[in-house]
């Protein structure tokens, strides 16, 4: 049986760890409330932007396919608009997906349960399945956990975006978007997909693979877990009137769509990380309490045994003196 001193040390050590996990749980809970508020405010706006863009894309899809087939740029030959109106924005022209960029959103730190494991494994499956299908796949990694994971596996990392989580705002999303758009605008990439955790609740996060560019005409989200009614599904029934024209609207709408989509994915991922961390720290607190209770019981038993032994020795000595 361990000595009383060693048991006391173990109890003290577990209590110190419990203080840390309790503090981390409180911090994660406070940050999660703010992150949830941001998502609640941003989701309807992002969905409406995608809805309008999808409507324009569906209307102008035949013109885009004709331009792509003829190898003509978005402005057409000699800058002539296609179909009597301004042609599609260059970022909307769909090309065969031979070269794909997967943008993987992970965290910089651990202690958040299976958050990083789930996203990394899903991204790895996507990378390998597309590679086996004959596509050239490259990765853009956000978060040190993703970088370390794919470096160990020799994955083709095109870009590692550091410091994104240090200051998460629209300017950060725009900077990320600029780096992702550079190879797409040069024709080095045919499609860009976001791989991230979508926040459902503090205990539930769903890994999704969502096409960023070119935007899909309908719901472009492929979920890891079956979930009905995804937040990103645009309404096909909506009809819009465009002023002054679709082309002028697209010049402003497409960059806005890219920035908002990236910002939303970043907020979703951050909230998912905080939810996973909150759950993990709550479980750690409960486990620590259970360990402390067991060690306290063991300590009391050992102390009782020691006291009983001393009493027996005293009684035995007293009886010996009487004799």
From Swiss-Prot:
Annotated disulfide bonds: none
Main location class: membrane
Keywords: ATP synthesis, Cell inner membrane, Cell membrane, CF(1), Hydrogen ion transport, Ion transport, Membrane, Transport
One Pfam family of this chain: ATP-synt
GO MF: ATP binding; proton-transporting ATP synthase activity, rotational mechanism
GO cellular component, one term: plasma membrane
GO BP term, example: proton motive force-driven plasma membrane ATP synthesis
Chain spans, region Disordered: 215-237
Bilayer topology annotation: Peripheral membrane protein
Coiled coil regions, renumbered to chain: none
Location(s), subcellular: Cell inner membrane
UniProt keyword Protein biosynthesis, yes or no: no
InterPro entries for the chain: ATP_synth_F1_ATPase_gsu, ATP_synth_F1_gsu
Domain of life: Bacteria
Composition-biased stretches (Basic and acidic residues): 221-230
Family recorded in the similarity comment: Belongs to the ATPase gamma chain family.
Role, per record: Produces ATP from ADP in the presence of a proton gradient across the membrane. The gamma chain is believed to be important in regulating ATPase activity and the flow of protons through the CF(0) complex.
HAMAP family (alphabetical): ATP_synth_gamma_bact
Subunit relationships: F-type ATPases have 2 components, CF(1) - the catalytic core - and CF(0) - the membrane proton channel. CF(1) has five subunits: alpha(3), beta(3), gamma(1), delta(1), epsilon(1). CF(0) has three main subunits: a, b and c.
Protein's name in the database: ATP synthase gamma chain
């Amino acid at each position: 049986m361990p000595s009383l001193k060693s048991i006391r040390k173990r109890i003290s050590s577990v209590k110190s760890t419990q203080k840390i996990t309790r503090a981390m749980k409180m911090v994660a809970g406070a940050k999660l409330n703010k992150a949830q508020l941001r998502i609640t405010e941003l989701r309807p706006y992002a969905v409406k932007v995608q809805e309008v863009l999808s409507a324009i894309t569906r209307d102008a899809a035949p013109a885009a396919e004709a331009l792509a087939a003829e190898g003509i740029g978005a402005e057409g030959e000699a800058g002539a608009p296609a179909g009597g109106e301004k042609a599609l924005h260059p970022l909307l022209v769909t090309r065969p997906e031979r070269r794909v960029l997967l943008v993987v959103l992970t965290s910089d730190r651990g202690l958040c349960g299976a958050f990083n494991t789930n996203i990394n494994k899903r991204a790895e499956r996507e990378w390998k399945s597309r590679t086996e299908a004959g596509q050239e796949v490259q990765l853009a990694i956000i978060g040190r956990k993703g970088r370390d994971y794919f470096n160990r596996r020799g994955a083709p990392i095109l870009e590692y975006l550091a410091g994104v989580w240090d200051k998460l705002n629209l300017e950060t999303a725009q900077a990320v978007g600029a780096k992702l758009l550079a190879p797409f605008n040069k024709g080095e990439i045919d499609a860009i997909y976001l791989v991230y955790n979508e926040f459902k609740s503090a205990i539930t996060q769903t890994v999704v693979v969502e096409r960023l560019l070119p935007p899909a005409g309908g719901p472009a989200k492929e979920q890891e877990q079956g979930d009905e009614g995804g937040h990103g599904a645009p309404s096909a029934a909506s009809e819009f009137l465009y002023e002054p024209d679709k082309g002028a609207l697209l010049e402003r709408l497409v960059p806005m769509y890219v920035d908002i989509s990236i910002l939303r994915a970043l907020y979703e991922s951050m909230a998912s990380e905080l939810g996973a961390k909150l759950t993990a720290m709550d479980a750690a607190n409960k486990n620590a309490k259970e360990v402390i209770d067991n060690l306290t019981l063991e300590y009391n038993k050992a102390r009782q045994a020691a006291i009983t032994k001393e009493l027996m020795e005293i009684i035995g000595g007293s009886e010996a003196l009487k004799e």
